[in-house]
């Protein structure tokens, strides 16, 4: 039972880390990355679908992306979706390939993005701590029902705290890497 709680706790914490990595991937650094356009939705025969379902997004060079629609008639819709996104990008079309140049980040924009990244990291830490609290509550309930001894409860809480510390360190490391990416010119 204790092992189940610890295993479930570690799995949930790992999912929180994955969610944080996904959020970090959306935040633009100075380099081009296909995940930058992942959240853009395109009108496709009356339905809103993710850009990645109607086109191939590839890195052309460090500061530009190439979007190649799978259907010729989608070029205008994709171009419009990129322009109206909150990324402030200005695509240009050459035949069926849409080139998306990424303007360099201003110092002010970098500072704003660092604030956003720090907030996302803090949200990740809070999620990890909430998972720890849930696990500790499960242990207390098991102790109350006499399913585990006080020693087992204490040992398990210490183990869960170690796991929590490990995942918080991982979040701090991810934050440090993302900040370094944002500050790199």
Curated annotation (Swiss-Prot):
Subcellular location: Cytoplasm
GO cellular component: cytosol
Keywords carried by this UniProt record: Cytoplasm, Protein biosynthesis
Record has Cytoplasm as a keyword: yes
GO molecular function: ribosomal large subunit binding
One of the GO BP terms on file: cytoplasmic translational termination
PANTHER family: MITOCHONDRIAL RIBOSOME RECYCLING FACTOR PSEUDO 1, RIBOSOME RECYCLING FACTOR
Family: Belongs to the RRF family.
Function: Responsible for the release of ribosomes from messenger RNA at the termination of protein biosynthesis. May increase the efficiency of translation by recycling ribosomes from one round of translation to another.
Entries under HAMAP family matching the protein: RRF
Protein name: Ribosome-recycling factor
Organism: Methylococcus capsulatus (strain ATCC 33009 / NCIMB 11132 / Bath)
Taxonomic placement: Bacteria, Pseudomonadati, Pseudomonadota, Gammaproteobacteria, Methylococcales
């Amino acid at each position: 039972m204790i092992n189940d709680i610890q295993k479930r706790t570690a799995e949930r914490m790992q999912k929180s880390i994955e969610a944080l990595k996904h959020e970090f991937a959306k935040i633009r650094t100075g380099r081009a990355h296909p995940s930058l356009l992942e959240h853009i939705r395109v009108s496709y025969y009356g339905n809103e679908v993710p850009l990645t379902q109607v086109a191939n997004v590839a890195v052309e060079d460090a500061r530009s992306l190439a979007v190649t629609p799978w259907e010729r008639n989608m070029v205008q819709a994709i171009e419009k979706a990129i322009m109206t996104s909150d990324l402030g990008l200005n695509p240009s079309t050459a035949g069926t390939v849409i080139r998306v140049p990424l303007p360099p980040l201003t110092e002010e924009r970098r500072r704003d993005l660092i604030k956003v990244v720090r907030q996302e990291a803090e949200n990740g830490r809070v999620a990890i701590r909430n998972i720890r609290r849930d696990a500790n509550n499960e242990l207390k309930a098991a102790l109350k029902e006499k399913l585990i001894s006080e020693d087992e409860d204490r040992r398990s809480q210490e183990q869960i705290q170690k796991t929590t510390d490990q995942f918080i360190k991982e979040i701090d490391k991810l934050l440090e890497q993302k900040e370094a990416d944002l500050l790199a010119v």
